[in-house]
C-alpha cells in the first residue's frame, strides 16, 4: 500500500532517495490510519491486502490522537502532513456523509477492479440509506475512477510542492 499513494514526501531532486524515504514512512502512516479507522467497521481489504479502502461513516468522531501518532510516524515530514491535512479539512463538508479517507491498490494489482469492489458495499449503503459520500482524489487516474462511480469534482486543492487533489462529492443514487 505504501507504493499506492506516494504523495507525502515532496517531489524534488534525488528521486531515488525520495522513493526510498516514501517506502520507509508510508507503511507506518497507512498502519496508523487503518488502526484509527478500524473502530468504524468500514475498513475493507482485498486479495491479501493488495487493495484497501478506509471509510468513516456519518457521525464518526475524529480520533484526537491520530495527528500526534502520524506526526511521529512521518518524522521530518510532519509539518508537510499537517499542512496537507489542514487544506483537506478546510474543504471537508460538514453534513453527515461517508468519507473515503483512503483507497489504494498496489501498483502490480491496479486495473483489476479491486478498488471498485472495495467501494461498492459502502456506495450501496449510501444509495440505500440516502447518504452522500465524499473523498479527495489524489491523482488524475483516481479522479477518473471516482467519476465512473458517480462522484463529481467540487473543488481543487493545490499542495505546496506537490500534486493537486480534487475534493469529490457523490449524491446517493436512486435505487
Where are these regions (language model features)?
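N-terminal secretory/targeting leader peptides
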Residues: 1-3, 101, 121, 143-148, ...
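Long, positively charged, glycine-interspersed low-complexity recognition regions
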Residues: 97-98, 119, 151-175
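Conserved GNAT acetyl-CoA-binding A-motif
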Residues: 96-99, 125-138
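Active-site rim helix/loop that mediates acceptor-substrate recognition in acyltransferases
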Residues: 19-42
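Conserved active-site alpha-helix within GNAT-family acetyltransferase domains
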Residues: 116, 128-130, 139-156, 160
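Conserved acyl-donor/pantetheine-binding loop and adjacent beta-alpha core of acyl/acetyltransferases
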Residues: 40-41, 49-110, 160-164
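Conserved acetyl-CoA-binding loop-helix of GNAT-fold acetyltransferases
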Residues: 105, 111-124, 148
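Helix-loop element at the rim of GNAT/NAT acetyltransferase active sites that forms part
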Residues: 1-20
Amino acid at each position: 500500500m505504501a507504493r499506492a499513494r506516494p504523495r507525502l514526501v515532496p517531489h524534488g531532486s534525488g528521486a531515488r532517495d525520495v522513493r526510498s524515504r516514501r517506502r520507509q514512512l508510508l507503511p507506518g502512516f497507512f498502519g496508523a490510519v487503518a488502526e484509527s479507522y478500524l473502530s468504524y467497521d468500514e475498513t475493507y481489504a482485498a486479495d491479501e491486502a493488495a487493495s484497501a479502502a478506509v471509510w468513516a461513516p456519518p457521525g464518526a468522531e475524529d480520533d484526537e490522537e491520530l495527528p500526534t501518532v502520524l506526526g511521529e510516524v512521518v518524522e521530518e515530514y510532519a509539518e508537510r502532513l499537517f499542512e496537507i491535512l489542514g487544506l483537506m479539512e478546510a474543504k471537508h463538508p460538514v453534513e453527515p456523509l461517508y468519507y473515503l479517507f483512503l483507497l489504494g491498490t498496489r501498483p502490480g494489482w491496479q486495473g483489476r477492479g479491486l478498488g471498485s469492489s472495495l467501494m461498492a458495499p459502502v456506495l450501496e449503503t449510501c444509495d440505500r440509506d440516502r447518504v452522500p459520500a465524499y473523498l479527495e482524489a489524489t491523482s488524475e487516474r483516481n479522479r477518473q475512477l471516482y467519476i465512473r462511480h458517480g462522484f463529481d469534482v467540487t473543488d481543487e486543492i493545490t499542495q505546496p510542492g506537490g500534486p493537486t487533489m480534487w475534493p469529490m462529492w457523490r449524491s446517493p443514487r436512486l435505487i
